[in-house]
């Protein structure tokens, strides 16, 4: 739960911009080129624009935002994008979102409050590794907090690795003229994760408190080879094959978690 600071009487609108960014990775091993292609097709179907729209619509509901407009697109050969414009106050009926022209007042608000997702399936050309990355951004202006959607987003996607950034920008002024650069208490993004999520992941923080920048990386603690194999079972592989695949997968996970290639 996001704990606000003692209630402030503001001069006008709360001008703080809060932005939560996710990189979520799913890692898989598919032995043959045909299996890797089927993995891409599977991911493309699982996370098409319709499914992503539903996830982001749920996010808007969770954080208490009103939907202004929805734009979505599936790409050829793979991938999808969805952008939802949101506000604190309802402007048009939810059923009409994406069907009506938006007023100038709403257009002026677009760059401030939105939820976006882009997907990036890809495969290694030789080694059998296949990955799916979803980039999600939730940016709000005012009292709405994107942190409320943390756990839902992690659970909604196949999250082997999660990289999160949260920042608060701008200021809001109280009736006495004093500027406030944040309106809630936070020491770490981890504060807002559910216990069952924290118990499953190893987590690492890099926070710059004086700049209101918070960064958390997570990867699953337990490694079950069957969870990473596509159209295959570990029991059907030789010991040598299992060790080779496990080494490849663990290396891929470490490199994605740290954001750099490891030396051979």
UniProtKB/Swiss-Prot annotation:
GO terms for molecular function: adenosylmethionine decarboxylase activity. Keywords: Autocatalytic cleavage, Decarboxylase, Lyase, Polyamine biosynthesis, Pyruvate, S-adenosyl-L-methionine, Schiff base, Spermidine biosynthesis, Zymogen. Binds 1 pyruvoyl group covalently per subunit. One of its GO terms (cellular component) is cytosol. Gene3D superfamilies: S-adenosylmethionine decarboxylase. NCBIfam families: SAM_DCase_Eco (TIGR03331). Belongs to the prokaryotic AdoMetDC family. Type 2 subfamily. This is S-adenosylmethionine decarboxylase proenzyme.
């Amino acid at each position: 739960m996001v704990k606000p600071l003692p209630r402030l009487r503001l001069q006008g609108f709360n001008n703080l911009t809060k932005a939560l960014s996710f990189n979520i990775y799913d890692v898989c091993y598919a032995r043959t080129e045909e299996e890797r292609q089927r993995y891409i097709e599977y991911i493309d179907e699982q996370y098409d624009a319709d499914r992503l729209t539903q996830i982001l619509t749920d996010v808007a509901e969770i954080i208490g935002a009103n939907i202004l407009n929805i734009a979505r697109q599936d790409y050829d050969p793979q991938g999808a994008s969805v952008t939802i414009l949101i506000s604190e106050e309802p402007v048009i009926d939810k059923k009409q979102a994406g069907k009506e022209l938006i007023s100038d007042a709403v257009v002026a608000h677009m760059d401030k409050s939105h939820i976006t997702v882009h997907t990036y399936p890809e495969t290694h050309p030789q080694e059998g590794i296949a990955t799916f990355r979803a980039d999600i951004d939730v940016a709000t202006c005012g009292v709405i907090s994107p942190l409320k959607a943390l756990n839902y987003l992690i659970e909604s996607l196949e999250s082997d690795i999660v990289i999160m950034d949260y920042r608060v920008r701008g200021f809001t002024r109280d009736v006495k003229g004093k500027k406030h650069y944040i309106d809630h208490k936070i020491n770490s993004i981890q504060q807002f994760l559910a216990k069952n999520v924290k118990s499953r992941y190893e987590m690492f923080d890099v926070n710059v408190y004086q700049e209101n920048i918070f960064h958390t990386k997570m990867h699953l603690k337990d490694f079950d080879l069957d969870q990473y194999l596509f159209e295959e079972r570990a029991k059907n592989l030789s010991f040598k094959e299992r060790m080779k695949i496990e080494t490849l997968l663990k290396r891929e996970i470490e490199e994605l978690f740290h954001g750099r290639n490891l030396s051979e």
